């Protein structure tokens, strides 16, 4: 019993000190959730001038319940599920639509296309070389394309993750944590039969530990169309620059960030707020 209590306390303390967690970043880190524990994050996003080329809709989008769940199954293996419970768009304009729509009035809403993925840490960081990992997964077709927000297609992706920590140690963690992602996404073209678009995935992020409880975070993240001409509708290049903060308090990590679009198909600006909780050990993975 004493050993059990000490173990639970140790894991609870690690929730306060764990570095390089995702929210509010979109760039993946290399850190693995402790085996048998779950990290649960939820947030709200607000975007101005969001574009949906497939439906021709432009408007201000609110994402309610941006959920990210990470579960460790081994010291170097983690499963993830992420998506938004409900997307709302206040329509500012409607251009020509490539698909039939079921939209009335000046707003629309829909469920999100959820993503399921696995992350594997392949190599630990050394004094000179970064840690290396691999993430792969797929996006499920959960949306109703007639609502004008999602594309309701299956998309798959894989990416390589690099991470290196620098600087003097604060507590048990170096002050600066740099993360990089590079990968390939295969996106189904919604209105072109037997067609896909292979997009280049990228992400570069940094987390600066200002104090024991406050981090400053920033990143660029997105995808790039690899075709010589225009991308098939619904697979265009998008990207964001984000800058924000993470604050640890009361066993939780709160976050906030501002977002700025990097391409003509990205939302112009936005803000995101969220909270993350790391559970104690709740199950024992199979061996």
Q: Where are the regions a protein language model picked out?
A:
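Bacterial N-terminal signal peptides
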Residues: 5-15
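Transmembrane beta-barrel domains of Gram-negative outer membranes and organellar outer membranes
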Residues: 20-287
């Amino acid at each position: 019993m004493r050993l059990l209590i000490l173990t639970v306390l140790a894991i609870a303390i690690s929730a306060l000190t764990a570095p390089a967690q995702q929210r509010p970043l979109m760039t993946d880190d290399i850190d693995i959730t402790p085996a048998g524990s779950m990290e649960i994050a939820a947030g709200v996003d607000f975007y101005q001038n969001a574009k949906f080329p497939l439906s021709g809709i432009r408007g201000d989008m609110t994402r309610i319940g941006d959920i990210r769940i990470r579960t460790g199954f081994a010291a170097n293996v983690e499963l993830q599920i992420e998506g938004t419970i409900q997307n709302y768009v206040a329509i500012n304009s409607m251009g020509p639509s490539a698909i039939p729509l079921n939209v009335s009035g000046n707003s629309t809403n829909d469920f999100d296309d959820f993503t399921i993925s696995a992350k594997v840490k392949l190599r630990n960081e050394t004094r000179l070389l970064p840690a290396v990992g691999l993430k792969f997964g797929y996006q499920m077709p959960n949306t109703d394309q007639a609502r004008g927000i999602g594309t309701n297609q299956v998309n798959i992706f894989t990416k390589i993750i690099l991470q290196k920590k620098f600087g003097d140690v604060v507590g048990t963690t170096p002050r600066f944590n740099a993360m990089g992602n590079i990968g390939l996404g295969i996106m189904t073209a919604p209105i072109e039969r037997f067609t896909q678009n292979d997009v280049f995935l990228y992400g570069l992020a940094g987390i600066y530990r200002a104090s024991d409880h406050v981090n400053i975070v920033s990143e660029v993240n997105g995808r790039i169309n690899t075709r010589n001409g225009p991308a098939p509708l619904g697979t265009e290049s998008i990207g964001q620059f984000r800058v924000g903060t993470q604050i640890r308090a009361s066993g939780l990590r709160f976050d906030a960030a501002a977002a700025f679009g990097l391409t003509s198909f990205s939302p112009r600006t936005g803000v995101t707020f969220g909270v993350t909780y790391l559970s104690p050990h709740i199950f024992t993975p199979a061996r």
